[in-house]
From Swiss-Prot:
EC number of the protein: 2.7.7.6
Region (Alpha N-terminal domain (alpha-NTD)): 1-231
GO cellular component, one term: cytoplasm
Protein name in UniProt: DNA-directed RNA polymerase subunit alpha
Source organism of this protein record: Chlorobium limicola (strain DSM 245 / NBRC 103803 / 6330)
Length: 328
């Protein structure tokens, strides 16, 4: 029997300070010590685990290293790099992309000039100053945009196959601008040693504070579930049962590794899945229905078609196939 611990009835929201970018959330009452425990784990998950979009590198015509100056441009390359790090995006696209710009002076280069060639992303802080191109000068620049989690330093951000003159930059993927928590005492009945945890979350606008704490909570839950489901005793199986389990396991693994192109799908559905980088049945069933509907050109007709295909294999969306994935 597990001792019943005091738990919050719900998360309270401070409506007076709540905006699309800032939220103050209160969890109470908590057992003593759990305010700091939950505050720390939520803060770490929010800062390091939420996916986001950022500029990962650039290439400027006529520039071969990051400490150069550019003829006809007021700012040098280090200044431009610092400004590009501040550009914030909203994007559901999971693949990396590149956009090319040609800017002729007299011209102020702002973040709003960075436009996705295929609508992969949207710049949020369009007025952010990047550089000034002087009259008669031209700035040709390729900007590489990618998806990731947390923060990736430039030293680890140099993919193979990049052109000569590619300059990797520190990628700040996290959509969280700031997060902090405080812990105060609170009363339950006659006891005053319970705790109240107050969590302040500020985002860059690509995600709401409500969605950010919900996603962080789900990520944490997925990790602690491993401990909750742990059992120190193992069931005894006969050799024949072990063999049957192994055969079923291998059959499922092969099924999840089956290429999407082997399914009888329409050209439209194939193209949507390819753009979303969904290559196998395993990739497909790992997605949830609402996640698929967020992809470009993916509608309910395509969703119905995919459902019918999965039902043939007794599969569905939102499956956890972690144990079937190859390790190492």
């Amino acid at each position: 029997m597990i001792y019943q611990m005091q738990m919050p009835a719900k998360i309270e929201v401070d409506e007076a300070t709540h905006t699309d970018r800032f939220g103050r959330f209160v969890a109470q009452p908590l057992e003593r010590g759990y305010g700091v425990t939950l505050g720390n784990v939520m803060r770490r998950a929010l800062l390091a685990s939420l996916p986001g979009t950022a500029i990962t590198g650039l290439k400027i015509d006529g520039v071969f290293h990051e400490f150069s100056t550019i003829n006809g441009v007021r700012e040098d390359v280090p200044e431009i790099v610092l400004n590009l790090k501040k550009v914030r995006f909203r994007s559901n696209c999971k693949r990396n992309c590149k956009t090319s710009l040609v800017l002729n002076g007299q011209k102020e280069f702002t973040a709003g000039d960075i436009i996705a060639q295929e609508g992969e992303f949207e710049v949020l802080n369009k007025d952010l100053h990047i550089a000034t191109v002087n009259e008669g000068a031209t700035l040709k620049i390729d900007i590489f945009v990618g998806r990731g989690r947390g923060y990736l330093p430039s030293e680890e951000n140099r993919p193979d196959g990049m052109p000569i003159g590619f300059i990797a930059i520190d990628a700040i993927f996290t959509p969280i601008r700031n997060v902090k928590f405080t812990v105060e005492n609170t009363r339950v009945g006659q006891r005053t040693d319970y705790e109240k945890m107050i969590l302040d979350v500020e985002t860059d606008g690509s995600i709401t504070p409500d969605d950010s704490i919900s996603l962080a909570g789900k990520i944490i839950n997925e990790h602690v579930t491993f401990f909750a489901d742990f059992s120190p005793t193992e069931e005894e199986f006969t050799e024949e049962e072990f063999k049957q389990q192994d055969d079923e396991f291998e059959n499922m693994r092969k099924l999840f590794n089956t290429k999407i192109e082997d399914l009888d799908l329409s050209v439209r559905s194939h193209n949507c899945l390819r753009l979303a980088e969904i290559d196998t049945i395993g990739d497909l069933v790992s997605r949830k229905e609402d996640e698929l509907l967020n992809y470009k050109n993916f509608g309910k007709k395509s969703l119905t078609e995919l459902k019918e295909q999965l039902e043939k294999f007794d599969l569905k969306f939102g499956m956890d196939i972690t144990k079937y994935q190859m390790k190492g």
